[in-house]
Amino acid sequence: YLDDLIARFGIGFPTTKIFSDYARITLPDIQPIENPDLALFAFMEREEILFRTLEKHIIGERLSQGFDGDVESFISFSLSVQNRRKSRAGLAFENHLEYIFRILGIKYDRTAVTENKSKPDFLFPGKEEYHDPVFNPLNLTMLGVKSSCKDRWRQVLSEADRIDEKHLLTLEAAISVNQTNEMQSKNLQLVVPQKIHSSYTREQQSWIIDVSSFTEIVKDRQKTAGIKI
């Protein structure tokens, strides 16, 4: 892919939005309507491959120039590489999800402002309905998106007060039973792509839902609310 990457983007990184769009273009046979779980996983894997390919080339060019013994410049460069990887992983995850929601005809707002200036990653059907006191809260859904959870999953609990049951989508495999039990006690529903379910215990799998199931929940609520796109 390197020649095409350089032809398109030169010796530099495009925005995450542009790069995510490009990653999907290289997978024309993947259709989210048929299998949202497979599509999300395929898009993420392909973008990771493409990004590492371009990154290796760009970083190689910089390393070949050397740092002339400038330790601070080297450390700064190293940190920028690490930070770019972290930020791009999270944004790519959201970009591909946004594309899938659009293809499936799901209405949403991304990082809409709720109480205390909180910004849930995705709010369904959107901020207008959320802030409408007449709109039935049972037809509202929020989704936090974290490529890896660790202890950060608790952040989503305070991001949408009108919604009792929160949803969290992650790519993290084998989250501990203690953690998922705590999620359940906090009324947080974990969403994991189908391909990762086997890394969880049978008991956990009976509770975890996949991406397809989540999109069906949102579409059903959207239909109940009489919202059409």
Label the model's feature ranges.
Residues R102, A160, Q184:
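Anion (oxyanion) recognition and catalysis
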Residues D3-L91:
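Interdomain/boundary linker segments immediately adjacent to catalytic/signaling cores
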Residues T141, D164-T170, N187-V191:
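Hydrophobic beta-strand segments of well-ordered beta-sheets in folded domains
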Residues K146-D151, L171-I175:
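Short beta->alpha connector loops
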Residues D70-S118:
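Acidic-basic catalytic patches of nuclease active cores, encompassing PD-(D/E)XK
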Residues A173-I229:
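Domain-level recognition of nuclease-like catalytic cores that cleave nucleotide substrates
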Residues F122-S147, V156-S158, L168-L169:
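Conserved catalytic cores of phosphodiester-cleaving nucleases, focusing on short active-site segments
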Residues R152-L169, N178:
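Short, charged, amphipathic alpha-helix that recurs within catalytic cores of restriction-modification
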